[in-house]
């Protein structure tokens, strides 16, 4: 429980500084990941996902919480091309479970503006 409180405090502090960081990151022209925090319990990163620039196919071994710093529609695309749209509202958090073994996906920002998300990935099973 104490670790969860620490993570929540860290995420809240990060969200408060997001506006300042965003001013620096406005010059970004392609999708980028910015590591924020990493230990044996959680891994936290911020990603700015540019419009219509698919991320490389990848896999998530662990469950994660996505916090939409800016809202929009993120299309989750599997290797066969099937699209699962996720509509994320600014300031809201969303739970995404670990992916099944060997499953892959790509993320595509379906909007016309960059989307910023904070990802908190849990590293341990309960």
Map each language-model feature to its residues.
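Bacterial N-terminal signal peptides that target proteins for export
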Residues: 1-9
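A short glycine-rich, His/Asp/Glu-containing loop-to-beta-strand
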Residues: 29-56, 61-66, 119-120
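Short acidic-glycine-tyrosine-enriched beta hairpin
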Residues: 38-41, 81-99
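Histidine-centered metal-chelating micro-motifs
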Residues: 52-56, 92-95, 99-106
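Glycine- and acidic-residue-biased ligand/ion/polar-headgroup-sensing regions
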Residues: 60-80
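Ligand-binding loop in jelly-roll beta-barrel domains
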Residues: 100-125
């Amino acid at each position: 429980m104490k670790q969860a409180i620490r993570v929540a405090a860290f995420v809240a502090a990060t969200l408060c500084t997001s506006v300042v960081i965003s001013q620096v990151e406005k010059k970004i022209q392609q999708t980028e990941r910015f590591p924020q925090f990493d230990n044996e319990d959680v891994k936290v990163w911020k990603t700015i996902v540019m419009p219509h620039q698919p991320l490389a196919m990848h896999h998530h071994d662990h469950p994660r919480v996505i916090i939409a710093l800016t809202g929009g529609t993120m299309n989750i695309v599997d290797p066969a091309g099937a699209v699962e749209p996720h509509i994320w509202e600014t300031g809201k958090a969303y739970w995404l479970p670990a992916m099944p073994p060997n499953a892959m996906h790509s993320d595509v920002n379906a909007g016309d503006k960059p989307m910023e998300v904070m990802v908190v990935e849990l590293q341990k099973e309960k």
